[in-house]
Amino acid sequence: MKKLKINYLLIGIVTLLLAAALWPSIPWSGKPENRVAGIIARGELRISTINSPMTFATMNNKAFGLDYELAKQFADYLGVTLKITVRQNISQLFDDLDDGQADMLAAGLVYNQERVKNYQAGPTYYSVSQQLVYRVGNTRPRTLAALTAEQLTIAPGHVAINDLQTLKAEKYPDLAWRVDEKRGTTALMQAVIDGKLDYTIADSVAVSLFQRVHPELAVALDITDEQPVTWFSARDDDNSLSAAMLDFFNNINEDGTLARLEEKYLGHGNDFDYVDTRTFLRAVENILPEVQPLFEKYAREIDWRLLAAIAWQESHWDPQATSPTGVRGMMMLTRNTAQSLGLTDRTDAAQSIDGGMRYLQDMMDKVPDSIPKDERIWFALAAYNMGYAHMLDAMALTRKQKGNPNSWADVKLRLPLLSQKPYYSKLKYGYARGHEAYAYVENIRKYQISLVGYLSEKERQQQQTLALAEDYPAVLPNELEQPQETTLPFFKFRADKQMDNARMKLPGHLY
């Protein structure tokens, strides 16, 4: 998985050429047949997506996901509200376009030749490869050559089906697979780690995020090279929606919004550590419930889950932790820092978390106003680890190397250079363990992703349990003693009701 390199000159040229080609489709008033004009008249942009941390998910009634945030901003760009329909698999998404139930698909879908024969692709914004996955401890396949339909199961509409058909025709004549018409890719990955399936195929970003919550999932091999991800809409002679997408993406490229969102959702790195992730998740189950109230109490301006991730990186949630250099406690504070914060006992969990959060808040307050709000925390954490002055040096070095000193994606790449003499010798504040600060922030982000994913999945399971309980009302003891009917009470099947139940119920403000 990697972010696509952006060539701004090429974007400008392509924009001009497409703008000229799409000029007749731009939504001028007085053209009600125009697709964008219809969306504006209706007052809502209808998208279909799938449920995943990368595309769209909810926790505590708050929505998140790269495709969700982009689609929400695109709806704002059009001046309409966003209506979201969540489907179980990719085939259902394209059915929504065919049936006119969606204006576009925003679901991390890969661009390929088969899809663009029937649908209009939008701009691409990152890329993925398709990966064959299996469960840790089971036999790892080294090739696709001998896989059977009993071993390999794929979600309906998955882009890998086209690739497998090509491989079967050209290289692996014995290759076979089965399509599960009822389950999506996430459900199939779950079935793999549950031992119910041998293998499935998923994109590299989905696999990476799934591993943060289920480290038992392992990658056997890549079956494709990097493929661009894009939005899709219906293909016809009206290109107004494509023109609007192009202009929108050009705008967020130029103002840095796309880069910030990519860093937020794709910038957590690929160096997955099975043992470290499993250790963290076990602590989430066994230790976190005891200290979670403290994180919730003292988090203040940041999410408590992020504060918990910081504390895990510092001490593994051990209030008695002590380092060889003398820092102690849950947040590993120095004696001088603790005294400056008015703390009397660094090994008291409440005092340590409160003090560490106040110290971090001081760092956040120092971060220049030019830093975007959603990235200030990363600059502050780097400063928390290596000192604020060295953070200023990293920003200055980024500027000197023609990078963006206000972009965490650019600045973090310069952090390791602060420990290299050719660079630190020319900086105002000199040597710093910048490589440690880089690893410090990246580790915290990974732990946060694991924690958010774990809690989101737990919340979803609880909701499913409650929904199931509502379908099976309690029976009073005296009713158990009544004679049973000799015939079963059949009810009329309503297809529309079944489809309503299959859809995820979302917060009202999204409709």
From Swiss-Prot:
Residues 270-511 are annotated as: LT domain. One of its GO terms (molecular function) is peptidoglycan lytic transglycosylase activity. Its main location: membrane. It is an enzyme of class 4 (lyase). The active site is at E314. Keywords: Cell outer membrane, Cell wall biogenesis/degradation, Lyase, Membrane, Signal. Its EC number is 4.2.2.n1. It comes from the Bacteria. CDD domains: MLTF-like, PBP2_YfhD_N. GO terms for biological process: cell wall macromolecule catabolic process; cell wall organization; peptidoglycan catabolic process. GO terms for cellular component: cell outer membrane. It is found in: Cell outer membrane. Residues 1-19 form the signal peptide. Residues 20-269 are annotated as: Non-LT domain. It catalyses: Exolytic cleavage of the (1->4)-beta-glycosidic linkage between N-acetylmuramic acid (MurNAc) and N-acetylglucosamine (GlcNAc) residues in peptidoglycan, from either the reducing or the non-reducing ends of the peptidoglycan chains, with concomitant formation of a 1,6-anhydrobond in the MurNAc residue. It is a peripheral membrane protein. In the N-terminal section; belongs to the bacterial solute-binding protein 3 family. Murein-degrading enzyme that degrades murein glycan strands and insoluble, high-molecular weight murein sacculi, with the concomitant formation of a 1,6-anhydromuramoyl product. Lytic transglycosylases (LTs) play an integral role in the metabolism of the peptidoglycan (PG) sacculus. Their lytic action creates space within the PG sacculus to allow for its expansion as well as for the insertion of various structures such as secretion systems and flagella. This is Membrane-bound lytic murein transglycosylase F. It comes from Klebsiella pneumoniae subsp. pneumoniae (strain ATCC 700721 / MGH 78578).
